[in-house]
């Protein structure tokens, strides 16, 4: 049995920043994550993906961001319980008790759920025999950008992942086709502007109004990606690689059975302190939903600060918390 001030579920960027915020208030944390390492999707799915909306970093790789967040949290000595899921929740008076899939038991007065998309996997396009090409020519995640150097690549999708990877891989690929069923992209406007600028150079060809239709190749080696528009017009794209980016399947797993207000794979929270319908349990980051929610890492950082400050009052039996700037707090620690 472990006793702690706060249990954090999820060790992605928002979970890691929550450790720091808790530490600044003198709160001890135990952290549960299903992956073997910290970092969440940033490490598991796209360690080399450039992130553009972190203050003071015009551009930073996901892996580097996680490294810095882990370093920032380290002085507060968090206890990580990795490669295990939070399974059972029990309430005993003012305390919560969580049991994990490895029978680890942790007790605290506050829980911060920063589980991102929960358990995740790719939404795969419904193409015949696509599994024959997976891992050889078809990839849903990128963890080694260099292996795509000099390739002809088809990227399918219209969101941030598709657009950002098209921009990034255009630096090393021979040719990129970006296939999207509409001419309008849902990525950040500045990213779309960069995409269209690069398209004018010919490094990226925008294949809009089309959807994936079939794959052609031998022994897992892709030769052609066939696309079709609404009028059944066919185009054959000469390609070595297909990168379908159609988002992730979300599964909250055991969290869905805890009595939380869950809608469409998200946890409903108030938009003041991000508390759920169960007092003492908070949800922040991509897993949380409230009116006006923006799914940004930056938003999750702000939610971490607000929720942990509110949790402090519960953890320390109503003790008032007086706000101080980080420079003052660090000065006191030294």
Curated annotation (Swiss-Prot):
Stored SUPFAM superfamilies: FAD/NAD(P)-binding domain
The UniProt record lists the keyword Flavoprotein: yes
This enzyme's EC code(s): 1.18.1.2
Pfam families reported in the protein's UniProt record: Pyr_redox_2 (PF07992)
Binding site for FAD: 33, 41, 46, 86, 120, 286, 327
InterPro entries, A to Z: FAD/NAD-bd_sf, FAD/NAD-binding_dom, Fd--NADP_Rdtase_type_2, Ferredoxin-NADP_redctase_2
Reactions accelerated catalytically: 2 reduced [2Fe-2S]-[ferredoxin] + NADP(+) + H(+) = 2 oxidized [2Fe-2S]-[ferredoxin] + NADPH
Cofactor(s) in the UniProt record: FAD
Key words, A-Z: FAD, Flavoprotein, NADP, Oxidoreductase
Bound cofactor: record note: Binds 1 FAD per subunit.
GO function terms (MF aspect): ferredoxin-NADP+ reductase activity; flavin adenine dinucleotide binding; NADP binding
Top-rank taxon: Bacteria
Complex formation: Homodimer.
Family: Belongs to the ferredoxin--NADP reductase type 2 family.
Protein name as it appears in the record: Ferredoxin--NADP reductase
Species this chain originates from: Rickettsia akari (strain Hartford)
Lineage of the species this protein comes from: Bacteria, Pseudomonadati, Pseudomonadota, Alphaproteobacteria, Rickettsiales
């Amino acid at each position: 049995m472990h006793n702690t001030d706060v249990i954090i579920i999820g060790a992605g960027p928002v979970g890691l920043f929550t450790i720091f915020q808790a530490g600044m208030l003198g709160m001890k944390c135990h952290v549960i994550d299903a992956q073997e390492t910290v970092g969440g999707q940033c490490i598991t799915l796209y360690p080399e993906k450039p992130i553009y909306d972190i203050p003071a970093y015009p551009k930073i790789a996901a892996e580097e961001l996680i490294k810095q967040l882990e370093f920032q949290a380290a002085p507060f000595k968090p206890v990580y319980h990795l490669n295990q899921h939070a399974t059972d929740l029990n309430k005993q008076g003012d305390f919560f008790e969580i049991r994990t899939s490895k029978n680890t038991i942790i007790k605290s007065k506050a829980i911060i759920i920063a589980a991102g998309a929960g358990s995740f996997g790719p939404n795969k396009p419904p193409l015949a025999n696509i599994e024959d090409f997976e891992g050889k020519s078809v990839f849903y995640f990128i963890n080694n950008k260099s292996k795509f150097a000099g390739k002809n690549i088809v990227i399918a999708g219209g969101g941030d992942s598709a657009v950002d990877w098209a921009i990034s891989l255009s630096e090393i690929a021979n040719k990129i086709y970006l296939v999207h069923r509409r001419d309008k992209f849902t990525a950040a406007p500045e990213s779309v502007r960069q995409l269209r600028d690069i398209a004018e150079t010919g490094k990226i060809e925008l294949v809009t109004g089309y959807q994936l239709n079939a794959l052609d190749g031998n022994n897992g080696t892709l030769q052609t990606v066939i696309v079709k528009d609404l009028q059944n017009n066919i185009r054959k794209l000469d390609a070595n690689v297909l990168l379908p980016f159609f988002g992730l399947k979300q599964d909250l797993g055991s969290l869905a059975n805890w009595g939380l207000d869950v809608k469409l794979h998200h946890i409903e929270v108030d938009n003041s302190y991000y508390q759920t319908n169960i007092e003492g349990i908070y949800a922040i980051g991509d897993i949380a939903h409230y009116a006006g929610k923006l799914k940004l890492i930056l938003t999750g950082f702000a939610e971490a600060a607000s929720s942990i400050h509110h949790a402090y009052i519960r953890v320390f039996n109503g003790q008032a918390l007086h706000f101080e700037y980080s420079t003052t707090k660090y000065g006191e620690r030294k």
